[in-house]
């Protein structure tokens, strides 16, 4: 079974983490976006791509019960919802295991792209549907620094988790 972390690593490789700022788990409480996104990719030019990772059909379907998605799927509110929730994104994608593609094509609005995680010998992301350009919003230097700060916080949290795991393993020996 494909895990979220497998897709995260493949996304980071695909978007080239050496050339772009890539930060996982950006929540709305951080004041950067109007909703939580699983991965945020910022180019050197200051344009953002958001990615939502789904690893099961139930997970994918549940995403459409979120407030921002309900507003987006309402034909009377679609444009307003796009501007409210997605105005900081140039592109937005769903990243899924390859076997979810038929369901994803049926559920995900056409302006969002779809990446499929291919878990053959070399694990990689395949662009199954190209995202349409949503907005041409250029992030300010202040926004970019804030995202980098969030990325640093993620690194710290991961290092602390590794440290705790190593200490537990040492105690078992």
How does the language model describe each region?
Residues 11, 28-30, 39-41, 81-85, ...:
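Short, flexible, glycine/charge-rich loop motifs used to bind or transfer phosphoryl groups or to couple energy/partner
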Residues 1-35, 42-43:
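Acidic-basic catalytic patches of nuclease active cores, encompassing PD-(D/E)XK
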Residues 2-5, 9-17, 103-173:
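Non-catalytic C-terminal interaction segments of nucleic acid-processing enzymes
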Residues 26, 54, 118:
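Residues at the C-termini of beta-strands that transition into short coil/loop
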Residues 49-51, 93, 113-116:
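Hydrophobic/aromatic beta-strand patches that form the interior of the parallel beta-sheet core
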Residues 55-109:
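Catalytic cores of nucleic-acid endonucleases
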Residues 37-56:
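Active-site beta-strand-loop-beta-strand hairpin of nuclease catalytic cores
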Residues 19, 46-47, 89:
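A general structural motif
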């Amino acid at each position: 079974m494909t895990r979220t972390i497998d897709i995260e690593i493949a996304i980071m490789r695909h978007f080239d983490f050496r050339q772009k700022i890539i930060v996982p788990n950006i929540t709305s409480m951080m004041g950067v976006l109007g909703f939580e996104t699983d991965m945020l990719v910022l180019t050197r030019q200051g344009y953002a791509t958001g990615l939502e990772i789904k690893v099961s059909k139930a997970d994918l379907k549940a995403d459409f019960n979120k407030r921002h998605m309900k507003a987006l799927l309402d034909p009377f509110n679609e444009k307003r919802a796009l501007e409210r929730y997605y105005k900081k994104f140039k592109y937005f994608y769903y990243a899924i295991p390859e076997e979810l593609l038929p369901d994803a094509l049926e559920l995900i609005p056409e302006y969002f792209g779809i990446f499929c995680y291919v878990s053959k010998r070399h694990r990689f992301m395949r662009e199954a549907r190209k995202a349409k350009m949503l907005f041409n919003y250029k992030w300010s230097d202040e926004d970019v620094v804030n995202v980098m700060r969030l990325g640093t916080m993620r690194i710290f949290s991961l290092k602390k988790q590794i440290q705790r795991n190593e200490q537990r393993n040492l105690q078992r020996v």
